[in-house]
């Protein structure tokens, strides 16, 4: 009875919020959780409960995966609003759950999830799949070191969850031997856009986590993501789903022998497309089904908007605040487009989210490369 009351309360508050033209994506769930903080444990979830997490790219990956699944006729409940912490997730789940049977009405529950909130949201065995995009230096005042985030994610799941990981990131690739359940890996082979040396001398995850010798990189995609090997072969970069022949000018690449369109001519578009492809395949979709969604019904990019202003074309890029690699990718996009251009950059130079006046992440951005 308590669960029924919580579900009805959440739905009622959501409708009241909409009546007053408020989003109502977070507050209703917070009220429901105050009644019973463990209400999400009482929900009957669908066969597939997929989480997507990481320092950056989780929103784009979630959107792309939702597009692929819906294009193939699956009923997908997902947090399209971007509310990825506990209260927002609770609002989404309760609003899509039958108040009397407590069954979530979907084929797939797909969630963009903040790395620090997975454990606070679900019990360890709730997620059937977890996609991990990358682990980088991100929002340092809140998250601290990348190692802390890795351990938070690892402690949030058990052997019942399949992890789908970006093997190009040595931090994330540690799940290949630390996680006790099934592991699926994806990565992008050497491209014409790679660097032989990193932009910054302070590269995270530069050493093998097993033998502790310095990793040997054939090439760097960006940051510490790239093609690498351990000198003693203790730590292996292996990919089940592989991106080849990346062509940003034509917005395409090859995934496991199939030519795939990208919806944006930036490197991280290749990553979130490959991650979504891998996850969709792991839950049973065929290459043909995935290719149709990517190549025939292309998803419009939300992070890159093109506008017209006084007969000029304006590209507006959205980068994640307090994440240096996200800014670097935007700068790479600008640098790769030749010809004269006017550049306007904006950011909150001091974090307003915490009591700390943290600006350290700005110094890790290479503005002159």
Predicted regions and their residues:
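Buried hydrophobic packing segments
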Residues: 65, 69, 89-93, 273-283, ...
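A short glycine/serine-rich beta->alpha loop
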Residues: 76-79, 259-267, 315-316
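Active-site beta-alpha connecting loops in nucleotide-dependent enzymes
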Residues: 318-369
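A conserved, hydrophobic alpha-helical segment in the catalytic core
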Residues: 124-134, 224-238, 264-295
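Cys/His-rich short segments
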Residues: 191-251
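Acidic-glycine-rich active-site phosphate/pyrophosphate-binding loop
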Residues: 59-67, 244-257
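Phosphate-binding loop of NTP-binding sites
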Residues: 2-187, 197-207
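Gly/charged, well-structured mid-domain segments that form the phosphate/adenylate-handling core
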Residues: 247-248, 279-319
């Amino acid at each position: 009875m308590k669960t029924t009351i919580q579900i009805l309360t959440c739905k009622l508050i959501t409708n009241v919020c909409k009546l007053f033209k408020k989003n109502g994506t977070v507050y209703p769930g917070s009220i429901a959780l105050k009644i019973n903080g463990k209400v999400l444990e009482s929900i009957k979830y669908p066969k597939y409960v997929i989480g997507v997490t990481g320092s950056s790219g989780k929103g784009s990956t979630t959107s792309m995966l939702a597009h692929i699944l819906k294009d193939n006729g699956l009923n997908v409940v997902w947090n399209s609003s971007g509310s990825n912490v506990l209260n927002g997730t609770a609002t989404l789940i309760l609003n899509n759950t039958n108040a009397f049977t407590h069954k979530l009405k979907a084929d797939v529950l797909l969630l963009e999830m903040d790395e620090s909130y997975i454990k606070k949201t679900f019990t360890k065995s709730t997620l059937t799949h977890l996609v991990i995009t990358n682990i980088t230096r991100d929002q340092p005042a809140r998250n601290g070191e990348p190692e802390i985030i890795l351990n938070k994610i690892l402690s949030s799941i058990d052997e019942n969850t399949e992890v789908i990981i970006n093997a190009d990131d040595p931090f994330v690739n540690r799940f290949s031997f630390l996680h006790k359940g099934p592991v699926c890996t994806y990565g992008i082979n050497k491209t014409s856009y790679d660097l032989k040396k990193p932009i910054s001398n302070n590269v995270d995850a530069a050493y093998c986590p097993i033998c502790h010798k310095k990793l040997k990189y054939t090439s760097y995609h960006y940051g510490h993501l790239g093609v690498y090997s351990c000198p003693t072969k203790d730590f292996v970069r292996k990919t089940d789903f592989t991106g080849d022949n990346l062509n940003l000018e034509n917005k395409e690449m090859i995934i496991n022998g199939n030519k795939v369109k990208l919806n944006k001519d930036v490197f991280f578009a290749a990553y979130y497309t490959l991650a979504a492809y891998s996850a969709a395949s792991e839950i049973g979709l065929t290459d043909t089904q995935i290719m149709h969604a990517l190549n025939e019904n292309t998803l419009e990019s939300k992070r890159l908007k093109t506008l017209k202003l006084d007969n000029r074309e304006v590209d507006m890029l959205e980068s994640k605040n307090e994440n240096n690699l996200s800014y670097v990718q935007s700068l790479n996009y600008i640098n790769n487009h030749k010809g004269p251009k006017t550049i306007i950059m904006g950011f909150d130079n001091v974090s307003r989210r915490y009591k700390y006046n943290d600006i350290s992440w700005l110094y890790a951005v290479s503005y002159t490369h």
